[in-house]
């Protein structure tokens, strides 16, 4: 959601935010086999997100459809970006946490950083998201479940911000720079 907010704030195109948000969560609603059928992967399992983006004629999509596709693309693009760039973050495990403890501490800390940046940005769109129609008319995105996407968004918005935060693990500025660099790269890809 953090990356989605960055995208919205930096986009030069008009975006229907509720459609974008539902689109951004929608890849998580597709069954794994269907997901692989809808997208192109290389032999190493890396997705060709550019090919996904280029299959759409944005001139023939209305604002809501275009925003939905951009949200979906944003999710795919960020997954690939994070996969290749998260290792650039410096993790300082000075407390000698176990792997399991470290994983939970990193997730909690990044979730806290994300929450500070997002700062209730999406809550004002919740009613419109809750009423988002089931019939998104984009044949290239078969297999998505709008109801599941709405439920995932509701769950995200109702989550508590983690109180156990370990800022010494990952520098907040370094993490924010990773996110901003990703956003500038996706903007150049459009």
Model-derived segments and spans:
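N-terminal leader/auxiliary helical segments
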Residues: 1-190
């Amino acid at each position: 959601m953090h990356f989605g907010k960055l995208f919205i704030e930096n986009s030069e195109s008009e975006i229907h935010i509720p459609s974008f948000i539902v689109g951004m969560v929608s890849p998580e609603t597709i069954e794994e086999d269907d997901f692989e059928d809808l997208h192109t992967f290389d032999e190493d399992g890396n997705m060709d997100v550019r090919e996904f983006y280029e299959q759409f004629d944005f001139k023939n999509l209305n604002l809501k459809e275009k925003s939905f596709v951009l949200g979906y693309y944003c999710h795919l693009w960020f997954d690939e970006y994070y996969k290749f760039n998260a290792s650039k973050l410096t993790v300082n495990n000075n407390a000698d946490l176990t792997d399991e403890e470290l994983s939970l501490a990193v997730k909690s800390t990044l979730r806290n950083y994300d929450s500070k940046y997002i700062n209730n940005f999406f809550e004002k769109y919740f009613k419109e998201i809750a009423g988002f129609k089931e019939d998104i008319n984009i044949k290239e995105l078969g297999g998505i479940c709008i109801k599941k996407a709405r439920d995932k968004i509701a769950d995200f918005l109702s989550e508590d911000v983690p109180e156990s935060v370990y800022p010494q693990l990952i520098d907040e500025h370094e993490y924010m720079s990773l996110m901003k660099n990703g956003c500038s790269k996706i903007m150049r890809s459009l």
